[in-house]
């Protein structure tokens, strides 16, 4: 009975969520688009001409938002965007116009090589401007296990960013407050000159979800 009450409560909140309604009106696949939108408006992350990689992209609302920002440029002509968005996820994703999607686990060498190849082609052999990660583990409710899974996914995004970002590039990852949160923030501070924590209004109040932004890579010793 308690589980049914919880499900009915979640469904009621979801149906009446203003961000869900806005996403439906504006054609976004998920309300998560407005989390990125708010952070982008505050921090000016996405600009015309950029090459952007979206890790854990499905169902695709972050890729949609990034694509729309790159399309909103005087240099975006003939239906093309000014820049490139490369998205990857374990799960399938319906195509997003102008977004290159790879389905697979980028921890696997063959998938990682494909991702690198697509990114190099999109960037003209240069490094990239922005890495977005909305990756999240399946949470078990066991605090220490969940903390380890969250930290692991943040580490994957951080390692990818270190290898592929321009020195002036940025990394935005989803995280959750918990026992490993401060360690993740410290890792960002070791690798980026500017680190900020963001909790957009579109994140549900009851959620421990937060976002960590790193900008301007530090030189490797």
UniProtKB/Swiss-Prot annotation:
EC supergroup of this enzyme: transferase
InterPro entries in alphabetical order: RNA_methyltr_RlmE, RNA_MeTrfase_FtsJ_dom, rRNA-MeTfrase_E, SAM-dependent_MTases_sf
Coiled-coil stretches noted in the UniProt entry, renumbered to this chain: none
Keyword Membrane: no
Record localization: Cytoplasm
GO MF term (any one): rRNA (uridine-2'-O-)-methyltransferase activity
Major localization listed first in the record, in broad terms: cytoplasm
Keywords, comma-separated and alphabetical: Cytoplasm, Methyltransferase, rRNA processing, S-adenosyl-L-methionine, Transferase
Binding positions (S-adenosyl-L-methionine): 60, 62, 89, 105, 134
Active site: 174
EC number of this enzyme: 2.1.1.166
GO cellular component: cytoplasm
Catalyses which reaction(s): uridine(2552) in 23S rRNA + S-adenosyl-L-methionine = 2'-O-methyluridine(2552) in 23S rRNA + S-adenosyl-L-homocysteine + H(+)
Family that this chain belongs to: Belongs to the class I-like SAM-binding methyltransferase superfamily. RNA methyltransferase RlmE family.
Described function: Specifically methylates the uridine in position 2552 of 23S rRNA at the 2'-O position of the ribose in the fully assembled 50S ribosomal subunit.
Official protein name in the record: Ribosomal RNA large subunit methyltransferase E
Native organism: Cupriavidus necator (strain ATCC 17699 / DSM 428 / KCTC 22496 / NCIMB 10442 / H16 / Stanier 337) (Ralstonia eutropha)
Gene: rlmE
